[in-house]
């Protein structure tokens, strides 16, 4: 979060979520949306506000549906602590995490595991979308980045070229070429934009 605490699966409330909803609707010109969300409170709050704004704007909206696979990466014994606290209390584990981005010592969820579950959730949701719908997936910074990398056909345990998505920011993926959502699992995805937001002072996912 913005306070620098690894909140991961701790259900802290979301903030400034109306902004992302308004920005999403402002750039929208399609035939309907389907919303799928992590079940953590801060994500559900965001998803419901987005759905409400679409409803007020008169656009057809399905969801939000909740999917456990979209939860944030699990940070094991690092949960709920600042980096300073982790470095002081678990120096060996912290050093491993800083060097590798992984930490079996603290039982941090492996990047490839996070990426696969997020990818699977997105693909499953995309397959049931109509061709004229857009899919909005509400998740969390580290999970989003690893899910995107996995959707692009890369290994998130190896490729570290995408940072986590900041609070009230979003990324956009589109099916390759003229593919539909239903065929994107075969033809692949293209990252159209990443970590886009309307306020630079809202950071920290």
Regions found by a protein language model. Give the residues of each.
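GST superfamily/GST-like fold recognition
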Residues: 141-145
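Acidic, low-complexity terminal tails and accessory targeting/binding regions
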Residues: 56, 73-85, 127, 131-133, ...
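Generic structural signal for well-ordered alpha-helical scaffold segments
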Residues: 19-26, 51, 115, 119-127, ...
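Short glycine-rich phosphate-binding loop at a beta-alpha junction
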Residues: 30-39, 63-66, 134-138
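Active-site-proximal alpha-helix that buttresses catalytic centers in soluble enzyme cores
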Residues: 1-59
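A short acidic (Asp/Glu
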Residues: 45-48, 146-150
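Phosphate-handling substructures
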Residues: 4, 8-9, 52-120, 203-205
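Soluble or luminal CAZymes and related metallo-dependent hydrolases
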Residues: 10-17, 110-118, 129, 165
């Amino acid at each position: 979060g913005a306070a620098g605490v690894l909140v991961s699966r701790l259900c802290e409330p979301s903030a400034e979520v109306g902004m992302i909803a308004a920005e999403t609707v402002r750039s929208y010109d399609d035939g309907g949306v389907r919303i799928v969300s992590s079940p953590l409170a801060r994500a559900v709050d965001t998803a419901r506000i987005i759905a409400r704004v679409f409803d007020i704007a008169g656009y057809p909206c399905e969801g939000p549906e909740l999917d456990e696979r979209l939860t944030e990466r699990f940070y094991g014994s690092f949960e709920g602590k600042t980096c300073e606290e982790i470095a002081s209390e678990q120096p060996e584990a912290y050093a491993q995490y800083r060097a590798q981005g992984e930490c079996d010592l603290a039982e941090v969820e492996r990047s490839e595991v996070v990426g696969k579950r997020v990818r699977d959730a997105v693909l499953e949701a995309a397959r049931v979308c109509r061709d004229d719908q857009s899919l909005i997936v509400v998740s969390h910074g580290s999970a989003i980045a690893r899910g995107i990398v996995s959707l692009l056909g890369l290994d998130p345990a190896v490729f570290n070229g995408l940072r986590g998505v900041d609070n009230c920011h979003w990324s956009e993926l589109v099916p390759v070429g003229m593919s539909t959502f239903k065929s994107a699992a075969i033809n692949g995805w293209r990252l159209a934009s990443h970590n886009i937001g309307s306020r630079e002072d809202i950071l920290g996912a």
